[in-house]
């Protein structure tokens, strides 16, 4: 697991979305041998709860999450599985 990369992803999401809950996992080991793994980009999953998601559609929530780490996509992040919830949904 790349702890530095995880902390950078976490920091970017926290700065952009002020989550009340954030669980971020490096799932790269589950994708060893996958074509995307060769590029060095990791596979991650995130469960994030933020007030910014209240009243937002799923596609908007995902866009907000992707936007928070946009500069890392396709180089350091190959895949990101997202569960994005509003506090009222927890």
Spell out what each predicted region is.
Residues 1-37:
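N-terminal first-folded block
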Residues 1-3, 50, 68, 76:
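N-terminal/domain-start segments enriched in small and hydrophobic, helix-friendly residues
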Residues 18-20, 40-44, 76-80:
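A generic structural signal for short beta-strands and their flanking turns/coil linkers
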Residues 25-29, 49, 83-87:
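Short loop/turn motifs enriched for small/polar and acidic residues
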Residues 31-34, 43, 62, 78:
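Histidine-centered active-site/metal-ligand motif
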Residues 33-51:
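A short, structured beta-strand/loop element
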Residues 45-55, 78, 83:
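Conserved interaction-surface patches within small, structured recognition/assembly domains
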Residues 58-90:
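C-terminal structural segments of small proteins and small subunits
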């Amino acid at each position: 697991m790349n702890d530095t990369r995880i902390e950078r992803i976490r920091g970017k999401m926290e700065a952009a979305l002020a989550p009340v809950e954030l669980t971020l996992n490096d799932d790269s080991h589950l994708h060893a041998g996958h074509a995307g793994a060769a590029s060095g980009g990791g596979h991650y999953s995130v469960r994030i709860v933020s007030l910014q998601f209240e009243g937002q559609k799923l596609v908007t929530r995902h866009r907000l999450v992707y936007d928070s780490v946009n500069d890392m996509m396709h180089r350091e992040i190959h895949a990101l599985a997202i569960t994005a919830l509003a506090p009222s949904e927890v």
